[in-house]
Amino acid sequence: ADVKKALTEAEGDFDKAKELLRERGLAIAAKRSDRETSNGCVLVKKVNDFAAIIALKCETDFVANGADFIKLTSDILDAAIAAKAHTLDEVKTLKVGDADAQAAVTQRSGITGEKMELDGYCVLEGDNIEVYDHMNKHTLCTMVQLNENNEEAGHKVAMQVAAMRPVALDESSVSEETKKTELEVAVAKTKEELVEKAVNAALKKAGINPAHVDSEEHIETNTKQGWLTPEQAEEARNIKKTVGEEKAATLNPTMIQNIANGRLAKFFKENCLVDQEFQFGDGDKQTVAQYLASQSKDLKIVAYQRFTLAAE
């Protein structure tokens, strides 16, 4: 309907109609700049030794699932792979049909009335790359590159990347900033839990249910409902303050650090791809690294990429 309307306004001039749609797209982009583009289409493709993922984002799943929208995403990805583009800025300038990719997106925005934007462009280059579109739903795509040719292993690891969303290939690939942040979180959580344990023990000794006084809101509500007497409420506040402060002041730094280090090790195991528990094996539990070694003693992951529009 919008295309027909543009043609009518352009008196049958296709070039003028396209320009009208492009102008509408620009107006929509400006007007709806604060809108969320949480839906869209994510595609992945490999041609010879070059593979890429790209996402074209929009506002609704109705538009995202439309054949024209998916085709536009596919056309842009084809152009990117043909040009072996390495950045999203490069992709936006590539010819798609009779316009550049960004103009084609803007024109489609003018047709649908929704804000649209390109995102998530990433590439892998070289041999032994496997690509995966999760359930062929075009919302989550992955790519994995191995150091040896093993399509089955590559495909399974690509599924692993989709399912378990690793943050890094291995521990050495985790940024120092992430390690520092995770260790700080682990230390804070350990201190909090040890203090809470001491406070709860003191509350129970005083005959007070810790669940009834875990927040000031609960203390007030449970006092009104008769679960606590005013005296118990005041005693609970006093215990939480004094015991909490005393315990926090006497925590053993070495013990705290050891527990936090254990938590950091758990973070690496759960979030580093090679250390994750392999989800697609046939027998005993094994890590991804162990699975690869069972296929070929020198088989390793060179690199991986993952992009999704789904909330996780």
Spans of features found by a protein language model:
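N-terminal assembly/interaction segments in proteins that build large macromolecular machines
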Residues: 1-312
